[in-house]
Amino acid sequence: MDSSIFCGGIPALMTPANADHTPNTAGLVKKGQDLIAAGMNAVVYCGSMGDWPLLTDDQRQSGVTALTEAGVPVIVGTGAVNTRTAVAHAEHAQQVGAKGLMVIPRLLSRGTSPAAQRDHFAAILSAAPELPAVIYNSPYYGFETKADLFFDLRNEFSNLVGFKEFGGADALSYAAEHITSTDETLVLMAGVDTQVFHGFVNCGARGAITGIGNCLPAEVLHYLKLCGQAAEGCATARRHAKELEQALHVLSVFDEGPDLVLYYKYLLVLLGDTDYEHHFNPSDRLSESQRRYAEDQLKLFQPTEPRFGMAMSLSSSPSLWGLK
């Protein structure tokens, strides 16, 4: 089964909220279209970046439908407490023309049971056999999918074509050594912004699900291009990729923490996107010090454009990180 939908840059879409704290579907679609127009290969919706625990199942599926009808290639997240609900999201994804599944482990109930997780994964994969899927591995879920479980599932479900790793460098290295290097058709995805270089250069990752890419798509796409060239042995690209990784570091670290959605929505507002001013829980907000910190870090990353309200002017500094 074709796994190319999981390659390249793939932002995990955030769900914009209206002033009454309901989903702004028009804003969601616009952001998805803008990111694809910028060069992203696909988008993920609805994952943790999309605030899936704060949305109803109907709201999540309405967002998926709106994106697919607008021609945005969507990888659908199956996060749910109940396996039946996860299966319903997978079935809906296939029905409306989504391009792939990001299969999330069973949560809260029997989450540490390998047998329960095996049954959970199998139910989702069998619900949408026409969609290529990756298993999402993350320490936040309290369960680690190892090679034995992955290949037990792959032997039964040909639509399981890859592995997304949100853990750190060691977890990515394990996935490369024991899972995705077994078969060249399997795709490894870097699931956190801080591990993109390690994932691409040292582990053979071919895709990155990104948070900061929602805010700085051109810069992140260039970073991915450099990482890909570095993985092919280009020393100049390797040096430029490391420089850009360091410049992006703090903005990327936001992707690792519990306030990632608050930070990236705030960065979008600073960059002029008013669709992201509101949150679903009115009490969800960054502290004053967090906001100032985010402002300072964005300014630091944008040496050629000190004002907020517009993206970084790359053309005024053509040698910056190897940009042409």
For every predicted segment, state its role.
Residues 63-64, 71, 95-96, 121-122, ...:
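Short alpha-helix boundary/capping motifs
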Residues 71, 128, 157, 271-272:
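A broad structural signal for alpha-helix termini and local helix breaks/kinks
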Residues 198-324:
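Structured C-terminal cap/extension of enzyme domains
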Residues 2-144:
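Active-site beta->alpha loop and helix N-cap motifs at the rims of alpha/beta catalytic domains
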Residues 7, 46-49, 76-78, 161, ...:
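Short glycine-rich loop/turn motifs that provide flexible caps or phosphate-binding loops at active sites
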Residues 28, 60, 64, 86, ...:
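A general structural signal for well-ordered alpha-helical segments in protein cores
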